[in-house]
Amino acid sequence: MILDSLETKEKILKEFLQTCAFDGWSKEALVKAAANCGIGENFLPLIFENGLLDLAEFYFESQNEKSAELLGSLEGKKIRDKISLSLYARFAVEKENKIALQRLINFYLNPKNFTSFEMGPRPAFQALQVCYNIADFIWKNIGDQSTDFNYYTKRATLGKIIFRAVSVFLKDGDVNNFIDVEIEKVMKFEKFKSKAKNLLAKNLLAKKTWDKKTFCEIFLNEKGSPRSPKEFVKNLPFFRLFS
């Protein structure tokens, strides 16, 4: 048996998902899982160098691959539908390991980690990184090829939805409905942002010079008197969107 092989990691993970239901996402559970696979505790650093953190990372990577297999082909579907279906599948593969996932979340949020020399803030940081990584996996899986600033905003936005959806999922809520609502919010905001940008461009950027007429339209009312602050703000293109 090759200690750091994929097969060895998968065997230990399979055992661990059973033991952690009783012992939590803990070193004790990991040692038991390894022992059940015939591997001594002293060999664990060769398999999972950073212990429970590396095990968690391996778990999420495995679950990502399973969700992609469950999802199948997305050819011909809209981006919004690809994202929704990808999230449905990602949480669907967690159903059989819901208890283990709850143990892992408890591990991430355990305040004792911050006073532990071995752990410190790393579990909390990994919790955020995991959400970003899952979002990154989903975007790449549906063929996203963005390389500009959108690359990061897409993943940050989707990662936030994933982060919030985990709580709904663990409380046995309708996670698919939650996903739909959150994506709809994002879509509405993007439409609003696009309209705001176009309106600002039309009303401000299109004017190459600020002539007397332009100045009067913005700063003076119909009677030729200076606009009050309230009137001025209300007349700005951005605020017109709310009227």
Regions found by a protein language model. Give the residues of each.
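Amphipathic alpha-helical packing segments from all-alpha helical-bundle domains
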Residues: 115-144, 155-159
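Short, amphipathic alpha-helix enriched in basic
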Residues: 5-32, 36-42, 50-57, 61
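Amphipathic alpha-helical segments used for helix-helix packing
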Residues: 95-121, 129
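C-terminal ligand-sensing/allosteric alpha-helical core of TetR-family HTH transcriptional regulators
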Residues: 82-93, 100, 123, 130, ...
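N-terminal intrinsically disordered/low-complexity leader segments
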Residues: 1-5, 216
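C-terminal peripheral helix-coil segments that are non-catalytic and often amphipathic
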Residues: 172-243
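Hydrophobic alpha-helical connector segments
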Residues: 6, 70-107
